[in-house]
């Protein structure tokens, strides 16, 4: 065990220092330690391989694995950075990142509220014990049933347009209630992230624009509606944001709106939600802004804006990926290895139906071959979906893999299972949660009969 403890210390050292220190081989490891070791590029060590093989044998592949300790640690890190600097603080979890009820329950137990984007996510939040008033409902296209449900529950409706405001007013009048609302604001800020998840730019479909006073006029209109209770302002400029500049500019603009609403309309907001979007490292050696970096950058802007407004709303934050992304591992098994005149394909038993991000966003995920360290070769990790674009990782130098080997894809805890599908009539993967050296199924594997669960039984045709 002393050797194991030394190895774990080395896992936490800086990459530069680790390069100078001989790293003892991990001959045994708990499941949690094996997950950490895979992140530290130690997936070839015998103890790590034993742990992953145990998971594959017990639960099958493809398999989503989540590290409970990582999720808790991320919440603690964000709270430790912001709580000392912002006395009025509320943190929510963006449920769309990972909708598994056990994951959500873990975050609820850490004191987080729920940010949802659909009726299904509303019902998921209720299922794990959230009360309606603890929920913020954000969507750019809410249907009448969703608006009705949110008002019934007393959730905060994050209104995206004047058209929606009218619908919310009408439904609140029908229910003889006051609808709790904030407006989603488009601040016109480019956070320099992937285009498909860049939501703060002017051409985005999200929010009421600050420019030309559009957002201000929405508050002015809502103030005259007795069915509406204005509670806050919201913005979310994008996801996988790696620098503080976009947040600082957004905060400055949003606090300017807070000041204008107070001075010109006598509207005092209970909260200002700056959204989520904190990025995580998807590549080895990648250095991003930390929660501490972001909190330090926002603190002076917040204090200045609050002083100018003459009061302090509660700061709301709503990360998703930051909490769960790094906790997730997609464990797959190699079906075949195929060499062509141009490439070598390692074909695994998962595809973009299992992990959509590489195909949809050209997203990069680190890949490890379990239990292998020798004979590296340049390969593409190809999925089992019948599409040319089903490549999970392209042009990676990895130890030589063979049929039956295990390959793990890292940082798959956010927008992994939650974006998965049954395309190509392949059942959904299982999900397990690791706590120390224990694992438990938190979603069982889909079955072939379930592929037909909502269809009418067809009568066989005779020829």
Give each language-model segment a name.
Residues 1-9:
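Sec-dependent signal peptide recognition
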Residues 14-16:
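N-terminal signal peptide c-region/cleavage motif recognized by signal peptidases
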Residues 20-173, 177-180, 216, 225, ...:
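A charged N-terminal "starter" segment
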Residues 71, 96, 118, 150, ...:
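Conserved, mostly hydrophobic/aromatic
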Residues 97-99, 120-121, 141-143, 161-163, ...:
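Active-site-proximal loop/turn and secondary-structure-junction residues that shape catalytic pockets
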Residues 103-104, 127-128, 147-152, 168-171, ...:
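Short acidic, glycine/serine/threonine-rich loops at helix termini
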Residues 188-336, 424-426, 435:
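Active-site loop/helix belt of alpha/beta enzymes
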């Amino acid at each position: 065990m002393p050797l194991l403890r030394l190895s774990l210390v080395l896992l936490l050292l800086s990459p530069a220092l680790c390069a100078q220190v001989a790293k003892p081989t991990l001959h045994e490891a708990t499941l949690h330690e094996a997950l950490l070791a895979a992140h530290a590029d130690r997936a070839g060590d015998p103890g790590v391989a034993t742990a992953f093989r145990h998971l594959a044998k017990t639960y099958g592949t493809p398999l989503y694995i989540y590290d409970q300790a990582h999720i808790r640690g991320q919440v603690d890190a964000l709270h430790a950075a912001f709580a000392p600097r912002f006395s009025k603080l509320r943190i929510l979890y963006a449920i769309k990142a990972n909708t598994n009820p056990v994951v959500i329950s873990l975050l609820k137990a850490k004191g987080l509220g729920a940010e949802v984007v659909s009726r299904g996510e509303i019902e998921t939040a209720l299922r794990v014990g959230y009360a309606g008033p603890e929920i913020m409902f954000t969507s750019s296209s809410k249907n009448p049933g969703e608006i009705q449900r949110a008002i019934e529950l007393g959730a905060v409706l994050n209104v995206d347009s004047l058209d929606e405001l009218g619908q919310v007013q009408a439904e609140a009048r029908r229910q003889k209630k006051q609808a709790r609302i904030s407006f989603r604001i488009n601040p016109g800020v480019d956070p320099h992230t992937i285009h498909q998840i860049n939501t703060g730019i002017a051409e985005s479909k999200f929010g009421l624009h600050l420019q030309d006073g559009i957002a201000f006029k929405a508050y002015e209109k809502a103030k005259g509606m007795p069915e509406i209770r204005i509670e806050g302002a919201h913005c979310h400029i994008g996801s996988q944001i790696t620098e503080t500049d976009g947040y600082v500019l957004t905060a400055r603009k949003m606090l300017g709106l807070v000041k204008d609403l107070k001075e010109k309309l006598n509207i005092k907001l209970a909260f200002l939600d700056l959204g989520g979007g904190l990025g995580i490292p998807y590549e080895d050696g990648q250095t991003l802004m930390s929660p501490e970096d972001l909190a330090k950058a926002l603190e002076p802007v917040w204090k200045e804006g609050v002083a100018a407004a003459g009061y302090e709303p509660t700061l709301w934050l709503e990360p998703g990926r930051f909490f769960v992304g790094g906790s997730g591992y997609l464990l797959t098994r190699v079906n075949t290895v195929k060499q062509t005149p141009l490439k070598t394909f390692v074909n695994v038993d998962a595809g973009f139906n299992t992990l959509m991000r590489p195909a949809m966003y050209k997203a990069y995920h680190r890949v490890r071959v379990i239990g292998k360290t020798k004979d590296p070769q340049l390969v593409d990790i190809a999925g089992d979906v019948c599409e040319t674009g089903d490549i999970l990782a392209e042009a990676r130098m990895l130890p030589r893999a063979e049929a039956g080997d295990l390959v793990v894809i890292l940082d798959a805890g956010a927008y992994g299972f939650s974006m998965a599908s049954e395309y190509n009539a392949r059942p959904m993967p299982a999900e397990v949660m690791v706590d120390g050296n224990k694992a438990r199924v938190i979603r069982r594997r889909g079955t072939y009969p379930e592929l037909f669960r909502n269809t009418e039984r067809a009568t066989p045709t005779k020829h």
